[in-house]
């Protein structure tokens, strides 16, 4: 898990993770190392790594965005049901599609509706927006206390000994994608 977001939420989530859960290697990429190591060395992951998730801050653009796009296999963008997030997502999608890093080597891109309360005006607007894109709208993730609990203990939904079946069902389209 490579965390480029200065907020450090991903790194904090991992710090809360207990040793009995599967280990996840973390790189705090938002920190600049002062001990005279190269950036490449700082971002190095173990050789047996099979999957990498890159967490970027909202609003990343320009050369930084292009660099991230060159180092990824796919782009997954969570969007919450708010007019502000919908506008930000519109700009981000435009930036991705016009980025040299994407135009040189296009990658699969998809969106998910995140922290959703169904049957609300905000969700209806978000769903209409996501369905209007020429980009796959993979799934809708509900806003539940299960995610609050998971975040507190550095867990994912599938780490619970008795995960909520509805939560698992919501994640399945994303896993299949």
Question: For each predicted feature, which ranges?
Answer:
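C-terminal boundary of histidine-terminating zinc-finger modules
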Residues: 151-171
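Conserved C-terminal guanine-recognition region of P-loop GTPase G domains, centered on the G4
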Residues: 87-107, 114
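Beta-strand-loop-alpha "switch" segments that mediate conformational coupling across diverse proteins
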Residues: 117-118, 127-158
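Conserved nucleotide-binding/hydrolysis micro-motifs of P-loop NTPases
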Residues: 6-8, 83-84, 116-119, 146
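Structural beta-sheet core signal
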Residues: 1, 54, 77, 111-113
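Inter-motif core of Ras-like GTPase G domains
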Residues: 47-48, 63-83
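P-loop/Walker-type NTP enzyme "switch/lid" segment
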Residues: 1-62, 151-152
